[in-house]
Amino acid sequence: MSNYYSKDDNAILEIDLKALSKNYKNLKKKLDKKVNCAATVKANAYGIGDKPVVKSLIKDGCKIFFVAHFSEAVRLRNYSKSIQIFCYHGINLKNFKDFIRYNIVPVTNTLQQVLMIDSLNKQKKFNKKIAIHFDTGMSRLGLDKKETKWLIDNKSKISNIKIELVMSHLACADQPNNPMNEKQLQKFNLIRQQFKKSKASLANSAGIFLNKKYHFDLVRPGIALYGGNPFINKNIKLHNVIRLKAKIIQIRQIQKNDTVGYGATFRAKRDMLVGTIAVGYADGINRKFSNNMCVSLNNKDLKVLGRISMDLITIDISLFPELLNSKKIVYVDVINKSNNINNISKNINTISYEILTSLGNRYKRKYI
């Protein structure tokens, strides 16, 4: 016997903007008054929606935002004409005019980009501020050792450039005792001394919690704003920002030895009542959660049975036999305050960043 329900939204992603605000304000409290707290809102604010996030943070006094792609920067500019926007992925001859048009600060990552800006300035084609990213150990983006040395030795050759910010990125800030943190700090301090008129930035979310000496003039939190713990083995107090609710769209009784899902990876050891919820790996619920996750209903954990499908997950609802003949629409919590992105990420040996940014576009997003 089974029941099938098809009304209302199949899955709802609730975003608590008040919790976001609390996280931002709590991060600011860890800083000296002279230190600016920017916000990293790349990847559509880590998947939860950059427009409401940016507007909420502006109300909290945030005036500086960081994104990865230029298209993201343009979107933010449409939300506000007054905020300062930095674009991590650099600048080139094809798009420099767009940086001027939208008043975006490019983060230059190579000596070639820096010299290009200098050349444009001499031609009076780019009279705008820039940021320079120096690689101090990440080996990903930024000027390498040779480029950094050349730039420092030849500062007089780039006198036309207005350097708003010098920055680097910590590779191991999520491990507070890793000696790499101190090594990068020392390298960055030496670089910063060569650009005293410019602001300096090193700390991401985890870097804020390391020590005030990592804060410099500007910090760039990302995941911590959204309730994600940036540390591997350290708990910090953050407010949960998201709640993911999925509707039970079908309920059925199965008997002992019946199997569930692709590959028949779950076999019932007893008669059970199972429900099917309308989310799957297409919505960002990783297949590694197959037989390896619980959702919750009325504060009771319900095990995931079998493999995660593209659009569906089957769960054990034997604790709620009254649901079988009920016409009530029932939602279960896939992610909530207790079963949050930090906790469930450990189940599949990943990080909260991946859980959050993977949440798909099919959810109805509700901002509260």
Predicted regions and their residues:
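Active-site anion/phosphate-binding pocket segments in diverse small-molecule metabolic enzymes
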Residues: 2-17, 21, 72, 91-93, ...
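Conserved PLP-enzyme active-site core in the AAT-like
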Residues: 30
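Active-site-proximal beta-alpha core segment in soluble small-molecule metabolic enzymes
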Residues: 4-7, 11-15, 19-22, 35-191, ...
